[in-house]
Design a protein with these regions (language model features):
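Short boundary/loop segments of OB/S1/cold-shock single-stranded nucleic-acid-binding domains
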Residues: 119-125
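Amphipathic, soluble alpha/beta structural segments
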Residues: 112-116, 136-139, 204-213
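Serine/threonine-rich low-complexity intrinsically disordered regions
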Residues: 2, 8, 20-23, 27, ...
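Intrinsically disordered, low-complexity, charged/polar segments
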Residues: 87-92, 97, 148-218
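Basic/aromatic-rich interaction segments and small domains that mediate binding to polyanionic partners
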Residues: 34, 49-76, 125-182
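N-terminal intrinsically disordered, low-complexity, charge/repeat-rich segments that act as generic
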Residues: 1-69
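Mixed-charge, Lys/Arg-rich low-complexity intrinsically disordered regions
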Residues: 28-30, 78-119
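Residues that cap or delimit alpha-helices
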Residues: 20, 76-78
């Protein structure tokens, strides 16, 4: 994890209300684990969205994580330390982990979608074309001009952009695995950090995934 990302996350966490210094320390440690294991972060948040009672991560070496999803609260436990957050604050916390710490895949990357999470009509569309659930990414963190951004825009692989099909708006949660990463260099890394992370935090932009969850909670 790059130092500038952790500094940005610390600034984001300071925006959250009613967090003690100890709470922030625990939540930072949890965030480092989640960002280092995107599959765990993904499974953890999907369980939350599905109103499951909890999610448990028990690694061989690292600290175990336990999430308990209650009606109005979320309890997060790491070893013997526990933080309790209102559901709305947990959503805000998750959005900052995603914004500041999650990997932003390069343009041109080919990813596989998780068909179990896709809308039925999209699954049928892929199947009718006899396509694998592969997508090539052509846009990242696209500002929707409503205070939110969509994680990725892409097109079905291997066809790419076609005039007879609309682009796909994709959430990080839909990504099952990365098949092939696109080209990246220091210019791309600088853009991701300074614009897609820092400028978005300054502008108050969050992923539409968490905006939708906020709407559902009201």
């Amino acid at each position: 994890m790059k130092e500038e990302q952790m500094i940005l996350f610390a600034r984001a966490l300071s925006i959250c209300n009613n967090l003690s210094e100890k709470d922030q320390e625990v939540l930072t440690a949890v965030a480092m684990t989640l960002s280092g294991h995107p599959d765990v972060f993904r499974a953890c948040y999907i369980a939350f969205m599905n109103d499951e009672p909890g999610y448990h991560y028990q690694p061989m070496i690292e600290a175990p994580l336990e999430f308990f999803y209650e009606k109005e609260l979320v309890r997060i436990r790491r070893f013997q330390e526990e933080v309790t957050l209102p559901r709305s604050l947990f959503i805000q916390y998750a959005s900052y982990v995603d914004l500041c710490l999650s990997r932003i895949y390069p343009l041109g990357s080919v990813i596989e979608l998780d068909r179990e999470l896709l809308p039925k009509d999209l699954v049928e569309s892929f199947e009718s074309e006899q396509m694998d659930f592969f997508v090539v990414l052509s846009g990242r963190r696209v500002d929707l001009a409503n205070g939110h951004y969509v994680d990725y825009i892409g097109h079905g692989y291997p066809f790419g952009l076609r005039f007879d099909t609309s682009p796909l708006f994709l959430s990080n949660l839909f990504i099952k695995r990365v098949v092939s990463e696109g080209y990246s260099d220091t210019v791309d890394e600088h853009y991701c950090q300074e614009v897609l992370r820092k400028d978005y935090l300054d502008a108050g932009l969050i992923s539409s995934v968490y905006a939708e969850e906020e709407v559902n909670e009201d």
